[in-house]
From Swiss-Prot:
Location of Phosphoserine modifications: S343, S394
Species in which this protein is naturally found: Saccharomyces cerevisiae (strain YJM789) (Baker's yeast)
Biological process, per Gene Ontology: endoplasmic reticulum inheritance; mRNA transport
Membrane topology: Peripheral membrane protein
Main location: endoplasmic reticulum
InterPro entries: She3
Composition-biased stretches (Low complexity): 326-338
Domain of life: Eukaryota
Signal sequence range: none
Membrane among keywords: yes
Name of the protein: SWI5-dependent HO expression protein 3
GO cellular component: endoplasmic reticulum membrane
Keywords of the record: Coiled coil, Endoplasmic reticulum, Membrane, mRNA transport, Phosphoprotein, RNA-binding, Transport
Length: 425
């Protein structure tokens, strides 16, 4: 605005001087040059002066035109300056705005750099955790595999034990039935002998004594078999307890938790869904496992009780009376010539006919023994399924005929007393 005021004032100052100068030009003496012929000497001076005045007027006109041009240029320059000042102000404002935006961007950039550093640290931590979890998963899988192998070995041993127990039970039930048949035959023979030799009261009394002793021996064998079955049931229950179902369940739970955490870290949705389904069905799995263990224990107890009804008996030499010819009975003379004389303590042909095999082993043929995997304990590590190390305190498990076995001292004493009594008679 000040530049515009200066241009207006300069033009207003030049305007009156210009008008005066133009008026002087109109009243110039050059017009009256032809009329003034009188004063020739002074006219030359005046003409020279007029020429000078003309020159000055021309220069004045040139200067006025130049001044006007300069004034117009000045006005243009002032307008340009005003425009430039306006542009400068606008640019200053824009510069301030850009500076503020730049500062904001710098702040955001610094915040982003901080976030990036934090995220990089978190990424490194999560990577380390993922490595640790992968190591734990590998270790847990190896432990699970070893435990599954132990469980399979225990199942194989348990199945072999059950098979051997069933074979023993069937074998000894057959032996008991055979012995019962033999006892029936012997009773028939004894009854026939009592009918044929009713006069010999002393021999009948000896037979009764021997039968009583035989019954006592049978009772002793039954008691030994009951003890044997009780010890077998204890061994079976102990082997079932050593499975340690709760520790297996805890290991399964830890593995499921590790898998779930690993899947959450890796964002595996399918694995999480399957793991959630397994965890939801965990109660049913635990109940089925407990029911299976209970049924196995109950079946073992039922087998132990049923084995009490089918006891094993040793091949004992049965007693027969020496036949003496009776003069009153004619039929006995014909039979006595055909029959061999037998001692009172000779073995029955049904019992003595069996031959002892050369390769006698404490296990039934067809049963494969495998090494036990369970840990030895203080109470049950010394006991064995097939034989006992201390025959005086606990009875041994019955074996098939022809296999060496131990008998209690009381049973041996009774057999010796039977032999002595027969020799005396």
């Amino acid at each position: 605005m000040s530049d515009q005021d200066n241009t207006q004032t300069s033009s207003s100052k030049l305007a009156p001087h210009h008008n005066i100068f133009m008026a002087n030009l109109e009243s110039s003496p050059t017009k009256d040059r032809n009329t003034s012929s009188q004063n020739a000497s002074s006219s030359r001076v005046i003409e020279s002066l007029h020429d000078q005045i003309d020159m000055l007027t021309k220069t004045n006109l040139q200067l006025t035109t130049q001044s006007q041009n300069l004034l117009s240029k000045l006005e243009l320059a002032q307008s340009k300056e005003s425009k430039l000042l306006e542009n400068l102000n606008l640019l200053k404002n824009e510069n301030e705005n850009l500076n503020s935006i730049f500062e904001r961007k710098n702040k955001k950039l610094k915040e982003l750099e901080k976030d990036y550093s934090e995220l990089s640290n978190r990424y490194n931590e999560q990577k380390e955790k993922m490595d640790q979890l992968s190591k734990l998963a590998k270790n847990s899988s190896a432990i699970e595999q070893s435990c599954s192998e132990k469980l399979q070995n225990m199942e194989v041993n348990y199945n072999s034990l059950l098979e051997s127990q069933n074979l023993y039970r069937d074998h000894y039930s057959d032996e008991i039935s055979k012995l019962n048949e033999k006892i029936g035959l012997l009773e028939l023979e004894l009854s026939n002998q009592n009918l044929n030799y009713g006069s010999d009261t002393s021999s009948n009394s000896d037979i009764e004594l021997n039968l009583n002793k035989f019954n006592d021996c049978v009772k002793d064998l039954k008691s030994l078999e009951t003890e044997k079955d009780s010890k077998l049931s204890k061994i079976i229950t102990h082997s079932l307890d050593e499975l340690n179902l709760q520790s297996w369940l805890n290991l399964y739970q830890t593995n499921e938790n590790l898998i779930s955490t690993f899947a959450e870290k890796m964002d595996l949705k399918d694995v999480l869904k399957r793991n959630d389904e397994k965890i939801s069905n965990k109660g049913a799995v635990v109940q089925t496992l407990k029911k299976n263990v209970q049924t196995q224990v109950e079946s073992n107890n039922a087998d132990a009780l049923s084995s009490n009804n089918a006891q094993d008996m040793l091949p004992i030499k049965m007693v027969k009376l020496r036949k003496t010819p009776n003069t009153n009975d004619s039929s006995s003379n014909g039979n006595s010539s055909n029959n061999k004389r037998r001692s009172f303590y000779t073995a029955s042909p049904l019992l003595s006919s069996g031959s002892i095999p050369k390769s006698a082993s404490p296990v039934l043929p067809g049963v494969k023994r495998t090494a036990s995997v369970r840990k030895p304990s203080s109470s049950s590590s010394k006991t064995n399924v097939t034989h006992n190390n201390d025959p005086s305190t606990s009875p041994t498990i019955s074996v098939p005929p022809g296999v060496t076995r131990t008998v209690s001292s009381t049973h041996k004493k009774k057999r010796n007393s039977m032999v002595v009594h027969g020799a005396q008679s």
